[in-house]
Design a protein with these regions (language model features):
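Glycine-rich, proline-tolerant flexible connector loops at the mouths of alpha/beta enzymes
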Residues: 26-27, 57-60, 80-83, 108-119, ...
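N-terminal pre-triad scaffold of radical SAM enzymes
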Residues: 39-77, 87-108, 159
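Conserved SAM/AdoMet-binding glycine-rich loop
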Residues: 104-190, 194-199, 206-209
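Flexible, acidic/Gly-rich N-terminal and inter-domain linker regions that tether
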Residues: 1-68
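Conserved, mostly hydrophobic/aromatic
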Residues: 14, 42, 70, 109, ...
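Generic structural signal for well-ordered alpha-helices
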Residues: 58, 96, 123-127, 150, ...
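Glycine-rich anion/phosphate-binding loops
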Residues: 81-94, 184, 215
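Conserved C-terminal portion of the radical SAM core fold
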Residues: 133, 165, 184-242, 255-256
């Protein structure tokens, strides 16, 4: 049996690999036999836990203002070409009303790290959604906050929180973010969310500038340690108004 298939079988049976093994397996992402083996196992697990159901989420992107300056992001603070907007509380609640009538039972409030939306504003919005739709799940995706802020949102009625770690490798994190931002803080935010009882989502880009197979292996090891309820993984897509505009997009095959 070829080495990549051996590693795939090992991953299937024990649910983890060592870093060097992950790197070796990821390096064989174009090997058809290995891809088929892993794809069949992924399909088996999907069928086991979700069957053939498709779960719809009502995504409300309520602000694209952001105080951060992440080098890969189209809504980064210094992008003067971005057309900025904020939804009012009334507009957000109207979106929920329309979504509920269409059958949505999960609302995801997503936005940049916008100082306008203080803890008080977020708590008020979450409480109103919770009181109006007690049978719905409320997910937030609004970036890095203090543990106390996360606690307030949870007490107001939020159930889930999405915060992609983007990369678990310190050097790679520095390549993608300005020095004011911290990978250690990003990871601590995720741990705080877990401790507070949120269903927590992490995740990363595949093919981001400066990323190596070692970076990807460290991402997988970090996720095993964190054990989030949700993981979002997608290929890097270069944005025309960032310093990475001319970088190649990430590989869909490697992402899968």
């Amino acid at each position: 049996m070829k080495r990549s298939l051996e590693l795939a079988e090992k991953l299937i049976h024990q649910s983890y690999l060592e870093k060097e093994e992950y790197m070796e397996l990821l390096g064989s992402y174009q090997d058809k036999e290995t891809v088929v083996c892993l794809g069949q196992e992924a399909a088996r697990l999907r069928e086991k836990y979700y069957g053939n159901k498709v779960y719809m989420r009502g995504l409300i992107e309520f602000t694209n203002f952001c105080k951060n300056n992440c080098y890969y992001c189209g809504i980064r603070r210094d992008n003067k070409n971005a057309s900025r907007y904020r939804l009012t509380e009334e507009e957000i609640l109207d979106c929920c009303k329309n979504g509920y009538e269409l059958g949505f039972r999960t609302f995801v409030l997503q936005g940049g790290e916008d100082p306008y939306f203080t803890d008080e504003k977020i708590v008020d919005i979450v409480k109103k959604i919770r009181n109006s739709y007690p049978d719905c799940a409320i997910t937030l995706s609004i970036g890095e906050k203090t543990k106390e802020s996360y606690r307030l949102y949870k007490e107001a009625g939020a159930d889930r929180y999405l915060l992609r770690h983007e990369t678990a490798n310190e050097d790679h994190y520095r390549h993608l973010h300005p020095e004011q931002m911290s990978l250690a803080n990003r990871k601590q935010c995720l741990r705080n969310l877990k401790e507070l009882g949120y269903q927590t989502g992490a995740g990363f880009m595949v093919g981001a500038p400066g990323q190596t197979l070692e970076c990807l292996a460290e991402d997988l090891i970090f996720l095993k340690e964190l054990n989030p309820e949700m993981v979002g993984i997608g290929p890097f897509i270069p944005h025309h108004d960032t310093k990475f505009a001319d970088e190649p997009a990430g590989s869909v095959e490697l992402t899968l």
